Design a protein with these regions (language model features):
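The canonical Cys-X-X-Cys-His
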Residues: 43, 49-59, 103, 138, ...
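Substrate-binding/catalytic groove segments of enzymes
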Residues: 114-116, 203, 212-213, 243-246, ...
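Electron-transfer interface patches adjacent to heme c in soluble/periplasmic c-type cytochromes
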Residues: 72-102, 125-135, 220-259, 270-283
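Long, hydrophobic/aromatic-enriched structural stretches that serve as scaffold segments
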Residues: 93-117
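Electrostatic cytochrome c docking/interface patches
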Residues: 24-48, 63, 168-197
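Sequence context of c-type cytochrome heme-c attachment sites
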Residues: 27-30, 41-44, 57, 64-93, ...
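Extended surface/linker regions that mediate inter-domain or inter-protein docking
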Residues: 6-20, 125, 130-193, 208, ...
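N-terminal export/targeting leaders of redox proteins
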Residues: 1-41, 133, 294-297
Length: 299
């Protein structure tokens, strides 16, 4: 009996050790972007498409103040409330002392410079598809923004979701850099896929999630409950959205729908971001949306 107990204990220790190793944070290889030089002007377009300011400016900031990425906005979810951190170039309170490698690992792998998992309220599962050139350009642009010494506030997340190592297990289930739309049959559709699935991370809001908070890729962009508990976020598949491509592109530039309604909530800033992009990008997003199948079954 004692031998059996010993075997069980050893097996448990081995399994725990294996789990600990498998869920460890996995940053990008150090120096993987050595020699890369960013273009801040191009980076501004990436910054806009990715909606960085929309989440990281101070609550109620307007105009140029939205370029001060001091954080503080609150994002409610079923797992707790996440507070956007300061990502301004301030070296003490922001990310001013980060290296390009640090930034790349946070954006594409969800790993902090301290080697901790970041919560997926930060959409690194989408940004994992970001091209390296765009990431380097984005980093160059962010260095030009004003610094803020506002301290980041802690997330309001209770047990067991406050155990960061658990995010590693979540990543094993859900963090895939693979495209949802596996085939993009034209350059326009390929660009639309890049904007929707990577930079603009549209799926983070418009796709339903399972009990663990992972995106249900089999129901891609079919709509979802609003994380704040108020209402729903509409679907974009043809069984949910009947707009034509021109109407979609116009909505992304103006915020006005064919039904004479207008964008509301966080979508207001999303529209403002898309309105600042080239016409070709809005047309590419519209082409992608029109290429979606009913029910969002792309797999």
């Amino acid at each position: 009996m004692r031998r059996l107990i010993g075997v069980v204990v050893l097996a448990g220790v081995a399994l725990a050790g294996a789990g600990w190793l498998l869920t460890a944070p996995k940053p990008l290889p150090e120096g993987s972007l050595d020699g890369a030089t960013g273009d801040a002007e191009r980076g501004q377009l990436v910054f806009t498409a990715a909606g960085c300011a929309s989440c990281h400016h101070a609550p109620d900031a307007e105009g140029e103040a939205r370029l001060v990425l001091s954080g503080g906005q609150r994002f409610a979810s079923a797992f707790g409330t996440f507070l956007a951190p300061n990502i301004s170039p301030d070296p003490a309170q922001g990310i001013g002392d980060w290296s390009l490698d640090d930034f790349a690992s946070a954006v594409k792998r969800g790993v902090s410079p301290e080697g901790q998992h970041l919560y997926p309220a930060f959409p690194y599962t989408a940004y994992a598809r970001m091209e390296d050139g765009d990431l380097v350009d984005l980093w160059a642009y962010m260095q030009t923004l004003p610094a803020s010494d506002t301290p980041s506030q802690p997330h309001e997340v209770g047990f067991p979701f406050n155990i960061r190592r658990g995010v590693g297990a979540w990543k094993m289930l859900y963090a895939s850099p693979d495209w949802v739309m596996t085939e993009a049959e034209s350059p326009q559709l390929e660009r639309g896929r890049y904007l929707v699935e990577a930079l603009a991370h549209c799926g983070e809001c418009h796709t339903p999630r399972d009990a663990l908070g992972g995106l249900d890729r089999s129901a891609w962009l079919t709509g979802a409950p609003n994380p704040n508990g108020r209402g729903t976020i509409p679907g974009l598949t043809p069984d949910k959205l009947s707009w034509g491509a021109d109407e979609i592109a116009y909505y992304l530039s103006s915020g006005f729908t064919p039904e004479y309604d207008s964008a509301g909530g966080h979508m207001v800033e999303v529209v403002e971001n898309f309105a600042a992009l080239p016409d070709e990008d809005r047309a590419a997003v519209a082409a992608y949306i029109k290429a979606l199948p009913e029910g969002g079954h792309l797999d």
